[in-house]
């Protein structure tokens, strides 16, 4: 199980991303509209002003039950080994058993 501080850090990043989402999107639209290079550099500077953790690339999908950041299945929101355990225990309807 992931440490609680890491999970809280991830939640903080999600809140920051939601807060600065509109600013980033509007700045990117402005860059595509402007033709002069100097104006593009100014707008690019605005894009760099929000905090780093507000960038969507800094977010990780985490397992719903354990908080593990790797090997997650989007459809279930679970990591691979938890998914396998739950499928074998017949807790996920519609999933077929496999052994690997």
Curated annotation (Swiss-Prot):
InterPro entries: Ribosomal_uS14 (IPR001209), Ribosomal_uS14_bac/plastid (IPR023036), Ribosomal_uS14_CS (IPR018271)
GO molecular function, one term: structural constituent of ribosome
GO BP: any one term: translation
Tree of life domain: Eukaryota
PROSITE patterns: RIBOSOMAL_S14 (PS00527)
Keyword annotations of the record: Chloroplast, Plastid, Ribonucleoprotein, Ribosomal protein, RNA-binding, rRNA-binding
Principal cellular location given in the protein's record: plastid
Pfam families (UniProt xref): Ribosomal_S14
Protein family: Belongs to the universal ribosomal protein uS14 family.
NCBIfam families reported in the protein's UniProt record: PRK08881.1 (NF006477)
Protein name: Small ribosomal subunit protein uS14c
Source organism: Liriodendron tulipifera (Tuliptree)
